[in-house]
UniProtKB/Swiss-Prot annotation:
InterPro entries: RlpA, RlpA-like_DPBB, RlpA-like_sf, RplA
Lipid addition sites, S-diacylglycerol cysteine: C27
CDD domains: DPBB_RlpA-like
Superkingdom of source: Bacteria
GO cellular component: plasma membrane
Lipidation (N-palmitoyl cysteine): C27
Gene: rlpA
Keywords, in A-Z order: Cell membrane, Cell wall biogenesis/degradation, Lipoprotein, Lyase, Membrane, Palmitate, Signal
Name under which the protein is recorded: Probable endolytic peptidoglycan transglycosylase RlpA
Organism: Aquifex aeolicus (strain VF5)
Length: 226
């Protein structure tokens, strides 16, 4: 888990001003998705040499590729290979395969990794903006698993999109009232014709669209994928 280190400083007049600013800003920002970065190609190298080891898990994990990318891993020691989907886990170093594959592939090795598919659907680059109509979903889906594998929480600033890579951050603007919210793409949808984005209850409330149900929107891509 990430650790945050605190420190103490004498509180002078400047310190009080800074402290009040931090308190006020923390009250106005509910989401933890604050980072704003450039739009970039998702991490999907066509070929790479990566350290491959094993974990007592059902799935394969990596910190090197977009979530749900599919790769071919070759052990140069014995020529054996495996095709497998990878799940993103930033605590993992290299690629961690299910332990059941050790008998076939052999001891941990520096593997040759070939990209078969970037992410869930092959999207390597996000557009700078998306526009259309957004709807929202909440209680009925609260606690259910999303397409990305995490549990849907209607009180988080989440979104569903048909093809943007999971982990993508969007700054969504309600074109009816100008209100904005930053959301994270964790699910697929919407599948209703004429709709382009599904937002969680919390995000919809922030945008003031609960009563409207569907609103015209514009979204700026702050981060493409994880």
């Amino acid at each position: 888990m990430e650790r945050f280190l605190g420190f103490r400083t004498p509180l002078g007049a400047l310190g009080v001003v800074i402290l009040l600013t931090l308190i006020l800003s923390s009250c106005s920002v509910k989401t933890s998705y604050k980072e704003k970065g450039r739009v970039y190609n998702g991490k999907c190298p066509e070929y790479a040499k990566v350290w491959v080891h094993y974990c007592p898990t059902k799935y394969a994990y990596t910190d090197r590729y977009q979530h749900l990318s599919k790769v071919k891993i070759v052990n140069p020691r014995n020529g054996k290979s495996v095709k497998i989907s990878l799940r993103l886990n930033k605590k993992v170093r290299g690629i961690c395969l299910p332990k059941r594959l050790k008998k076939y592939l052999g001891k941990p090795f520096l593997g040759k990794v070939y990209l078969l598919r970037c992410g869930e659907n092959g999207v390597k680059k996000c557009p700078k903006y998306i526009r259309g109509y957004a709807s929202w979903y909440g209680g009925k889906f609260h606690g259910r698993k999303t397409a990305s594998g995490i549990r849907f929480n209607q009180h988080e600033y989440y979104a569903a999109h048909r093809y943007l890579p999971f982990g993508t951050l969007l700054e969504v603007k309600n074109l009816k009232n100008g209100r904005k919210v930053i959301v994270k793409v964790v699910d697929r949808g919407p599948y209703v014709r004429g709709r382009h984005l599904d937002l969680s209850y919390a995000a919809a409330k922030k945008l003031g669209m609960i009563r409207d149900g569907v609103i015209p929107f514009e979204a700026k891509v702050l981060r493409c994928g994880y």
